């Protein structure tokens, strides 16, 4: 797993004023439209300032509004991916890959996305606009926050697909009857052409 993702994580060191150094695992975040440009880091394992447990979050100055960890063991470009796997953390994505790679050889070609724990419309739109034909796999944690993130992503997937459909005079009444964020089958069936 480390070899599969070796380009997609690093160790980050923060030098403190007292001479102490904090080292953590860092996952570079990029913009979906420009995956070569690093716009921040998702961090895991840094000591908290209050001395309690370890910290998981974003490095100071990270573009958390648009940036995501975007990784593919086979270096599959986002726009060419057939499978997109969405996670709340890069660490979870790598663990998923490690658990399932033997049974699913296609995972090497998949693109793994980490939102860093939060999910914004710009993050979702940035990925979905490039990956409409790809299968989107929602892999957030099975807790309340994960459920909220999954529902938000599901609604954005529906919106993106809906916006990609050509609106013809015959289709317009039905398409207009679909509630915002609902699947294509959410409209009034009697309005179908």
Where are these regions (language model features)?
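Short glycine-rich loop/turn motifs
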Residues: 21-27, 65-67, 82-83, 93
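TOPRIM fold recognition
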Residues: 98-193
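Helix N-cap/beta->alpha junction signal
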Residues: 88-89
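Short, glycine-/Ser/Thr-/acidic-enriched flexible segments
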Residues: 32, 92, 143-144
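Basic, glycine-enriched DNA-binding surface that flanks or lies within the catalytic cores of DNA
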Residues: 1-63
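Glycine-/acidic-rich phosphate or pyrophosphate-binding loops and their flanking alpha/beta elements
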Residues: 53-81
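Short, solvent-exposed loop/turn segments that connect beta-strands within catalytic domains
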Residues: 32-37, 77-79, 103-107
């Amino acid at each position: 797993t480390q070899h599969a993702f070796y380009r997609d994580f690093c160790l980050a060191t923060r030098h403190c004023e007292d001479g102490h150094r904090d080292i953590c695992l860092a996952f570079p975040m990029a913009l979906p439209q420009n995956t070569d440009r690093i716009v921040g880091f998702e961090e895991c394992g840094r000591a908290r300032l209050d001395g309690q447990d370890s910290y998981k979050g974003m490095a100071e100055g990270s573009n958390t509004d648009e940036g995501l960890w975007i990784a593919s063991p086979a270096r599959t470009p986002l726009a060419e991916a057939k499978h997109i796997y969405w996670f709340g953390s890069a660490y979870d994505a790598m663990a998923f890959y490690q658990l399932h790679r033997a049974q699913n050889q296609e995972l090497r070609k998949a693109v793994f996305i980490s939102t860093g724990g939060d999910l914004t419309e710009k993050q979702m739109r940035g990925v979905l606009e490039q990956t409409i034909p790809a299968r989107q796999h929602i892999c957030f944690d099975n807790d309340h926050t994960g459920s909220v993130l999954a529902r938000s992503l599901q609604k954005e997937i529906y919106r993106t697909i809906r916006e990609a459909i050509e609106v013809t005079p015959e289709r317009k009444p039905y398409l207009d009857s679909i509630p915002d964020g609902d699947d294509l089958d959410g409209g009034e069936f009697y309005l179908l052409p």
